[in-house]
């Protein structure tokens, strides 16, 4: 085998190894650090907004599930975290509008409008909670996103648990597998740069 072949083989092994690392980390990711069933806040992790300023199905599912949890009495308020992504619309504002349309009073909504990734979702939400003296949160997001979110929140000084937002429409096997694969790659990226969580940096 020539040097090019060895390089290709080594690169393939490295990529597969990193993917396996991410997959194992997702399987072992924590889902909570507390037995609490009632919390000071529900943190809704942002998802992209469409080009017309409306929630995407993923974002709508997260907000809808958070509204259900609010109505069940899990927490008295929602922290909606997400800044501007690929267009001019702020995720937190769109989520707040969606929550109000579903009957949540504006007084129960706390938008966090700066975060551009999941690390910042956690860090900036924690800063809001610390300012208000809130100490516990349920973290709502899509099921495929929650393992990475759990790894991130496990490094924050906060009592928390994750809660999955089921999709509003059934997902195809291809869509589900694609989402898991993308999250595995993002988990690897996070594991490489995990210490940045401690400094609230992207």
Segments from the language model and where they lie:
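A structural signal for short, hydrophobic/glycine-enriched beta-strand patches
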Residues: 23-180
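A transmembrane-helix-recognition feature enriched in membrane-embedded lipid enzymes
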Residues: 173-199
């Amino acid at each position: 085998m020539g040097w090019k072949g060895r390089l290709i083989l080594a690169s393939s092994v490295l990529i597969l190894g990193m993917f396996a690392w991410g997959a194992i980390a997702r399987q072992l990711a924590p889902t909570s650090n507390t037995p609490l069933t009632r919390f000071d806040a529900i943190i809704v992790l942002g998802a992209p907004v469409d080009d017309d300023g409306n929630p995407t199905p993923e974002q709508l599912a997260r907000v809808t599930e958070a509204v259900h949890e609010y109505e069940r009495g899990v927490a008295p308020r929602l922290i909606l975290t997400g800044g501007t992504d690929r267009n001019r619309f702020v995720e937190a504002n769109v989520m707040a509008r969606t929550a109000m349309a579903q009957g949540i009073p504006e007084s129960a909504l706390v938008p966090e409008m700066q975060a551009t990734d999941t690390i910042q979702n956690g860090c900036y939400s924690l800063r809001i909670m610390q300012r208000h003296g809130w100490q516990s949160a349920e973290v709502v997001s899509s099921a495929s996103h929650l393992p990475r979110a759990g790894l991130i929140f496990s490094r924050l000084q906060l009592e928390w648990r994750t809660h999955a937002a089921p999709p509003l429409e059934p997902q195809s096997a291809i869509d589900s597998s694609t989402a898991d694969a993308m999250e595995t790659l993002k988990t690897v990226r996070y594991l490489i740069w995990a210490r940045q969580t401690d400094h609230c940096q992207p």
